[in-house]
Amino acid sequence: MSCPVIELTQQLIRRPSLSPDDAGCQALMIERLRKIGFTIEHMDFGDTQNFWAWRGRGETLAFAGHTDVVPAGDVDRWINPPFEPTIRDGMLFGRGAADMKGSLAAMVVAAERFVAQHPHHRGRLAFLITSDEEASAKNGTVKVVEALMARHERLDYCLVGEPSSTEIVGDVVKNGRRGSLTCNLTIHGVQGHVAYPHLADNPVHRAAPFLNELVAIEWDRGNDFFPATSMQVANIQAGTGSNNVIPGELFVQFNFRFSTELTDEMIKERVHALLEKHQLRYTVDWWLSGQPFLTARGKLVDAVVNAIEHYNEIKPQLLTTGGTSDGRFIARMGAQVVELGPVNATIHKINECVNAADLQLLARMYQRIMEQLVA
């Protein structure tokens, strides 16, 4: 027996939408949404396709997601070509099956069923879809949110379809995310011959005490919703490759995943103070890719928990762990934001797959959430 959620997921997977190329995925979704009365607004920026769609008016529940996927990697290692979806032993294989074309299909089918049963729903149902989440994310959701905020668009609740689950659908719901701050630091010295260190100034030696103290800092202890802030050195480079040249510069890149116990400015101030303490000559460039956000228990979280308990008979964990998502941009609108999607065990991997039955279940959960908030 055919299943509309599985069929739409397969159609989306067949479109090789490597970020930021949408490859026709959004046109497929838009066609379905138009048929059930959605107004569509294309909001493209640069090489990125985005759309904002809505039906009804009043209190607004938006479903957000991305059509782009990461590269497939070595296609010879896939059990089936990555953009030719196949079902084996109940598992749907294909790039994007879990992240996140399965969620997109579940959203659309849930909306179709919801509108059929509630043609005169009281609230507004919306979609915010982008083709640039996996890559730079510079022309995607962030730009759409800026445009919506500029015209004072209303957004009360947003469900992001990121693959939040770990073992079964709904066992984990993300009701927040940590902030992400990257420091690109260059320590300046004086290049010279290793046999004449008095004529040079080795930036590696200079930086070592600073780095040793930096990695030992306890930034905070987290709180009831967030783990402790973490700092990790990601890249470090110095030298010419020769064994007889003292380097003139040391480059080090480190990233903070920070909780609501800190702000990005607090982190910057402490790092700069440490640099001054060690009397280093330096240049620094900071990149804030997202502030931490948290959606406490309320109408959206309660509706999501209710849907999971109703269909899967489990009580989900509310977590803020993991990387960043487009939820960090949407939260700026003052909306309650949560993430609920399929199991994430194979995302970005060879042979990415999702349990086909999970997608059908997810569509029912999404529909129940719609019914609780905007029916």
UniProtKB/Swiss-Prot annotation:
A GO MF label: acetylornithine deacetylase activity
Binding site for Zn(2+) 1: 66, 99, 162
Cofactor-binding details, from the entry: Binds 2 Zn(2+) or Co(2+) ions per subunit.
E.C. code: 3.5.1.18
Keyword entries, A-Z: Amino-acid biosynthesis, Cobalt, Diaminopimelate biosynthesis, Hydrolase, Lysine biosynthesis, Metal-binding, Zinc
Gene Ontology biological-process annotations: diaminopimelate biosynthetic process; L-arginine biosynthetic process; lysine biosynthetic process via diaminopimelate
Catalytic activity: N-succinyl-(2S,6S)-2,6-diaminopimelate + H2O = (2S,6S)-2,6-diaminopimelate + succinate
Residues annotated as the enzyme's active site: 68, 133 (proton acceptor)
Residue sites binding Zn(2+) 2 per the record: 99, 134, 348
Cofactors: Zn(2+); Co(2+)
Coiled-coil ranges (or none): none
Pathway: Amino-acid biosynthesis; L-lysine biosynthesis via DAP pathway; LL-2,6-diaminopimelate from (S)-tetrahydrodipicolinate (succinylase route): step 3/3
Entries under PROSITE patterns matching the protein: ARGE_DAPE_CPG2_1, ARGE_DAPE_CPG2_2
HAMAP family per the UniProt record, alphabetical: DapE (MF_01690)
Function per UniProt: Catalyzes the hydrolysis of N-succinyl-L,L-diaminopimelic acid (SDAP), forming succinate and LL-2,6-diaminopimelate (DAP), an intermediate involved in the bacterial biosynthesis of lysine and meso-diaminopimelic acid, an essential component of bacterial cell walls.
Complexes and interactors: Homodimer.
Family indicated by similarity: Belongs to the peptidase M20A family. DapE subfamily.
Protein name, as recorded: Succinyl-diaminopimelate desuccinylase
Organism: Salmonella agona (strain SL483)
Gene: dapE
